[in-house]
């Protein structure tokens, strides 16, 4: 064996050793996080029963919803998986997490691709590597941060939370939770509010092109917003990218995607707030009653309550 071959073998051995040490450090860190030794990990009870803030709905005697009241400017209304259009589910999985059905919260293949393409090759189209479950974990338990180092430190915690969520929930429940949590702007938090706000529809009635618009917004609800950016080509380009992802996943043919890509984005915008809907004066009166402090006897004369 020549000196050159010996040197090559040594380099290979050191590279494999370094590779093994990196993975050992990653798995050791994940184990430490899962045991609660590093970082904050929500208790099991909170993972099994996430705290959700939904709008309070005002329902008439015949069961008709005549309005809603939302806290902090949101208008989230829960919708079950069975009431979500298959077009929306297919578009979401194809675009955000193509291996959603096969992974357990962390897509190591997608993560490796993102590291190589984005981190090493500096390609903008490398993808983020985050699964739908990881994104849900971030929405539920990881407040947004503008600090890059802080975001990177939170990633391993999000991985562990995602793996635990996969243990406690079915894939259908995770899809439903994700779509119920996402903020589509204009007080449209959750897919039910978003479907009505942007298209005047219920989630189960969304067409392929409408579903693609909403899924496209999941990357950035401001940049790819068809109302906020109505004069920008970005929402249309993003929608068409979703079509191409659906082709790769086998949900659309090239001909179908090409035909859909020629369509303009047509919205039916309805910004939702508590003033819209049936009987606004009655609902406002009811809201004031519900928000009022509990009466105290000391605030009234005896003749006012002793009857």
PLM regions with names:
Residues 61-64, 71-72, 84-87, 95-98, ...:
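Solvent-exposed coil/turn segments that connect beta secondary-structure elements
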Residues 37-87:
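Terminal hydrophobic membrane-targeting helix
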Residues 2-59, 119:
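N-terminal type II signal-anchor transmembrane helix
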Residues 124-307:
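Non-catalytic, structured segments within soluble enzyme domains
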Residues 64-76, 111-118, 154-155, 300-303:
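N-terminal periplasmic "start-of-domain" segments of outer-membrane beta-barrel proteins
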Residues 5-9, 13-16, 86, 113, ...:
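Short hydrophobic helices that act as membrane-entry/anchoring signals
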Residues 50, 80-132, 189-194, 199:
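Flexible, acidic/glycine-enriched loop-and-adjacent beta/alpha segments
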Residues 50, 71-72, 104-109, 152-155, ...:
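Short, glycine-/polar-rich solvent-exposed loops and beta-turns at beta-strand/coil boundaries
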